[in-house]
Amino acid sequence: MMKIKIHRGLDQIGGCITEIWTESSRVFIDFGQNLPGNGKPTTPEEDALMVADIVENNEKEHQAVFYTHAHEDHVGLFPYILFDQFISEGGKELLLIKYKTLLEGNEIAREKCGRQRVPDRSEEERLEECCRRTKTLIDKLETFRTWKRTGRGDYPKPIMVGNIRITPFFCCHSIYDAHMFLIEGEGQRFWHTGDYRGHGYMSKGQFLMLRKYATNIDVLITEGTMLSREDKAISEYRVSMEMIDVMRAFKYVFVLASATDIERLGSINHATKKTKKPLCIMSLFVKRTMELFTKREGNLGRGLFSFSPLFYTDRLYSKLRDKGFTMVVGPSHGDKVKALLNRLPQEETILIYSSWNGYYMREEQVRANAKYKEFREMFHNVVDIHTSGHVDRDAIKKVIGMMHPKEVICIHKEADARL
């Protein structure tokens, strides 16, 4: 019989680690870093020891890690894994874009530091160490094995780890190319959902897929992020419609959103086109993720995921001052945004905050990273337009009702949340 151990995730959101094994083989689903305010904060040294303790405690002849998606709370401990690691093609590309862009920024900063009239040697050494660590992470990511997402209606190709068979199924989440897993071995069938939702553009067909393939399930391992919240998630399409109303009312629109969430960027793209504004960006990271999404998904949804943004520089200011704009930004762009805000009339300018409101409302989140709250406070006009990247309570009930699993294990949830 296959056995399951939830090392982390039963009483916290994020930082999930699930182990499934037989006599000869085992797989881990996700090895995630703890989120601020969820689980005990740890140092890199503590993370390395914790991973080693888990890995060495139940070693098998055949073993591997499978990542549901590329969010840090699911993939963040990858540097400490010494055997095969698998992730979707899109997930691997996103992670490489992230770390290569970070490396490029650190290298530029290091060169500037070295060219100063009186070089800051301690800062130069710090940046050198950052570059070295980031290169090591990139080298590690390059070794990741991947699977190719299948077309709608096609059965994905299973991956064998000893006598355990893992089949990845594409799902909708707030990051590109997320997957669920069917895990089979010794006559049993387990289904691990990872993070998912039923209200995005890419969730079409998701329940049909579950009805067709998630049959005779012995154990369902499902996320439960929204279990303690009674509100029903609005659709991604509704997000876009609400953005259109705001973009018609204001000439200069900044949208704070994740650069890795293809569907949210698609909502912004659609609203921007409908209101005939130029789509603008300030970040090389956003530029590169949009290029990835356009290359891989640009022919879907009548161009919903085909992006042609303008990269903002001062040379564009006069043109954009006349035409207005939609500017996709992140919390780390505060200085650039503030400089532009000082040149714009505040009564015609607004921030659409399109991220989780806990980043600026919850004390533990603000203590961990105050940039979201500080970013909002730069604007006179702010509106929240957002929907969750996670499945709501009603949709979880629907999934359980469709599968009729013999057992349900709920992870990625608050400690007091119950099905």
Q: Where are the regions that the model predicts?
A:
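Mobile, glycine- and charge-enriched loop segments
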Residues: 346-352, 360-389
